[in-house]
Amino acid sequence: MIVFGSKAEIHAKSILKDGEIPKRWYNILPDLPEPLSPPLDPETNETINPEKLTRIFAKELIKQEFSEKRYIKIPKEVRELYAKIGRPTPLFRATNLEKILKTPARIYFKYEGATVTGSHKINTALAQAYYAKKEGIKRLVTETGAGQWGTALSLAGALIGLKVRVYMTRASYYQKPYRKILMEIYGAEVFPSPSENTEVGKRFLREDPNHPGSLGIAISEAIEDVLSDEKARYSLGSVLNHVLMHQTVIGLEAKKQVKEFEEPDVIIGCVGGGSNFAGLSYPFIKDVLDGKAEYEFIAVEPRAVPTMTKGVYTYDYGDSAGLTPKIKMYTLGHTYYVPPIHAGGLRYHGLAPTLSVLMNHGIVKPMAYHQTEVFEAAVLFAKAEGIVPAPESAHAVRAVIDKALEAKRKGEETVILFNLSGHGLLDLKGYEDYLEGKLEDYEPQILNLSMAPRPPNAL
């Protein structure tokens, strides 16, 4: 139902010009309230030598990962590619949703689904592929959950001239077959994970031939694949600092766009590893850390994967097989059996180390929802605003609606900004299951933290 308003409400979006694409990424490392704990070598439990990572990652990405420079220049070629794929992305006001909810809150959203691949993931995919190409790397290997990251890297490889191989979590591989097709259109090889390609995959399939997979397992497979080919390197879609830094183009654009409207009181995003949440929030968090502003930051996760709300802040592996360095983060344990929810991009046992620090200091507050209440919110949003959110992004939508209803109860004109990180047009199986009453909610009664290693110096 369309709820008509006044002529003043016609101004309900902000679209920047190509020349306003940010020229620098924001690196939060020098502004964190405490130094980031170093990654540990899994063989020695000592701080890892960055040189050891060059067999896995492109060298420039390792440099960015540990850089203390607050701002890092975006290469001209990457900015040109950003313009090609749909940056800057629009910022909208959800006026019809506000009226349907009868809330005094004002709701704005940054729409990353406007990119050609349909999500925020292309922001770091282009950067990672660009640096890999410059270093003579021939092939990139990665994991993907819902397929958004795999799609983004597949297109980046096609645009820049790199081969791409994707290990897609088995549950999503079968839930979202059109994602696989899209990746293949862009020229990528796509395998369900666990797969028969790697020893890691074979081991998990022996344990359970119908294993739904997880991002942790897919990461293990991708790394094993990379270690077998000198010309290949690994690309990661979330968690690490350089990935989150590339995503700050979202928040840097949004900071310009909100000036056309008003400053937010609350900033909300969904969280799996943390990249889309960080992309929007980190430029605003900088103002809080500098004492220049006050915002409330809400990070939303599935109750089936309660990393932030029930996890432990300690050192753990970033993958399921223990091939990666150990990083200090909120974790459910790298052996946690992740239920096959439709939000495939949120099926990860850990959390970005930088976001973990901010959460540990109370700067970011976590929330968790079941997938049925998430899809309920997504359907309402689609009817109100016409955009079908990705199941991952719909977690943020659920929190936004609840925050707007809270403002209604309190009679407060709360200004809410959230990241609608992707559209759900290739995720309609989840919506079908919701509409037909087939969705299952999962909530772990026992968390498997037995494999979360805790070195003597861990807090």
From Swiss-Prot:
Reactions listed under catalytic activity: (1S,2R)-1-C-(indol-3-yl)glycerol 3-phosphate + L-serine = D-glyceraldehyde 3-phosphate + L-tryptophan + H2O
Residues with PTM N6-(pyridoxal phosphate)lysine: 121
Membrane-spanning residues: none
Keywords: Amino-acid biosynthesis, Aromatic amino acid biosynthesis, Lyase, Pyridoxal phosphate, Tryptophan biosynthesis
Record's GO cellular component terms: cytoplasm
CDD domains for this protein: Trp-synth_B (cd06446)
Pathway(s) served: Amino-acid biosynthesis; L-tryptophan biosynthesis; L-tryptophan from chorismate: step 5/5
EC number: 4.2.1.20
Alphabetical list of Pfam families matching this protein: PALP
Gene3D superfamilies: 3.40.50.1100
Cofactor(s) needed for function: pyridoxal 5'-phosphate
Role of this protein: The beta subunit is responsible for the synthesis of L-tryptophan from indole and L-serine.
NCBIfam families per UniProt: PRK12391.1 (NF009057), trpB_rel (TIGR01415)
Subunit structure: Tetramer of two alpha and two beta chains.
Family per record: Belongs to the TrpB family.
Protein name: Tryptophan synthase beta chain
Organism of origin: Pyrococcus horikoshii (strain ATCC 700860 / DSM 12428 / JCM 9974 / NBRC 100139 / OT-3)
Chain's gene name: trpB
